[in-house]
Regions:
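Beta-strand-rich N-terminal accessory domains
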Residues: 133-137, 198-238
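Catalytic-domain carbohydrate-binding cleft regions of carbohydrate-active enzymes
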Residues: 1-133, 140, 152-171, 177-193, ...
Length: 238
């Protein structure tokens, strides 16, 4: 067949032949983020539901989880997840993903509340119970809302379940004028650990941490970056 075709009738192609899906791998990053968020939330909901059923004899959330998985899988159809659907379709997709996250939040919160009600929280200060839905031990920052600080006093320290003081830090709160508390929690896999926020009376114990950012005229520097800024234009020069 090719031998019978005139040579000048064959076009010269100098670009990608697979042009119909151009850009769809980056289009609608929101739907890709929501898809992954729902996947992780559903896996965690399965764990919490199992824990609640086995340990607390709570109603099984299997049917709700199954329906939520069907919603996620439907939205993994290639036109939707790839980003090639029309914008109106993604309004429905956002609502669908929202219903999935609502389902997983309800299951998680129900089980956590049931477990928390059975934890001994007597003692000084206010208990801070940190849960870990992953099957391995993690060390992760925990943010304590300013409402606990208002209840206990201005200065707080954090101790673990053995009474050992945990380094903590005041940070800017999510509400205007408030300061939250930040500390690192070490929590076993598929478990919880109880910390306590205790008021610091008298002279508050305060230690200056390592200076993370060095600032001088036209220079910002930390362990990884040294950025010089033009004092007139504000542009980064190096």
């Amino acid at each position: 067949l090719l031998e019978n075709l005139p040579a000048d009738s064959l076009p010269v192609v100098q670009t990608d032949l697979q042009h119909h899906a151009r850009g769809c791998y980056t289009a609608h990053s929101e739907v890709k983020r929501l898809n992954r968020q729902c996947e992780h939330s559903l896996v965690q909901a399965e764990r919490w539901s199992t824990i609640g059923t086995v340990l607390q004899h709570l109603p099984d959330g299997g049917e709700s989880i199954r329906q939520a998985w069907e919603t996620v899988l439907f939205n993994q159809f290639h036109d939707i997840l790839a980003g090639t659907s029309i914008e109106a379709a993604y309004q429905d997709v956002r609502n669908a993903y929202g219903s999935v996250l609502l389902t997983t939040d309800k299951i998680r919160n129900r089980v956590i509340q049931e477990i928390a009600k059975r934890i001994d929280t007597t003692g000084e200060g206010r208990s801070i119970v940190v849960f870990n839905p992953l099957p391995w031990r993690i060390t992760s920052p925990v943010r304590v809302p300013s409402s606990i600080k208002r209840f206990l006093g201005r200065f707080l320290g954090v101790v673990d379940d053995s009474g050992k003081e945990i380094p903590s830090q005041d940070i800017v709160g999510q509400q205007v004028g408030n300061r939250d508390l930040l500390f690192l929690a070490d929590v076993p896999g598929l478990g919880y650990r109880t910390y306590r926020g205790i008021p610091l009376t008298g002279t508050a114990r305060k230690q200056e941490g390592k200076q993370m950012l060095h600032v001088e005229s036209g220079l910002l520097e930390n362990d990884y970056w040294r950025i010089r800024v033009d004092g007139q234009s504000g542009e980064v020069v190096s």
